[in-house]
Amino acid sequence: MLFRSKASAGARGLIFGAFGYEPDHPEFNILRDEFLNNYERAICVNTRLFEGMSELLVQLESHQIAWGIVTNKLERFTFPLMEQLQLANRSFATIGGDTVGVSKPHPAPVLKAAEICQLDPSECLYVGDDQRDIEAGQAAGMATVAAAYGYCGSDLPIEQWGADFIIHTPKDLIPIVFGS
């Protein structure tokens, strides 16, 4: 749990958390490359969905509601992870941090996901566990949901991210989606 809040910032955040090294440190690139190679080899070791997420996805799918993944994680890691979690063939849109040439908080990745799902951004609900997610969703014209159960890497309290909703478990999304 020590590095949980750093995970949202990827290798950069984890290396800073462990060593205090910024990207301009002489050893940063060596450590980053070693970290990413090890991560790639063990992409799904001890990795699981948040409790209640499987049930939420089944409920969305049973109502034919498109869902997808927009992550700043590079495709090199995103697609194998989705395969191993058995989500690759279920996600309507999977967008990695390098899919569209920019990453969140830029709105382009979430707009690409909406395009793939053939939805207007105003019809989308973007759920994220980092302030960058909320900023990206808002910039794209989507309703936003802050997932307090996630990694939440921002220094700003989640209540100050400006999300339309805050949820504490995946099942908290159900009344937001279905209006009940």
Describe the predicted segments one by one.
Residues 49, 70, 102:
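Residue-level marker of regulatory loop/turn positions in helix-turn-helix DNA-binding domains and
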Residues 1-55, 61-63, 74-76:
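N-terminal helical cap/lid subdomain that shapes the substrate entry/recognition surface
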Residues 7, 69-70, 128-129:
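Small/polar loops that bind or transfer phosphate-bearing groups
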Residues 47, 69, 123-125:
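Residue-level marker of alpha-helix boundaries and capping positions
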Residues 4-5, 25, 29, 43, ...:
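A generic helix-loop boundary/linker signal
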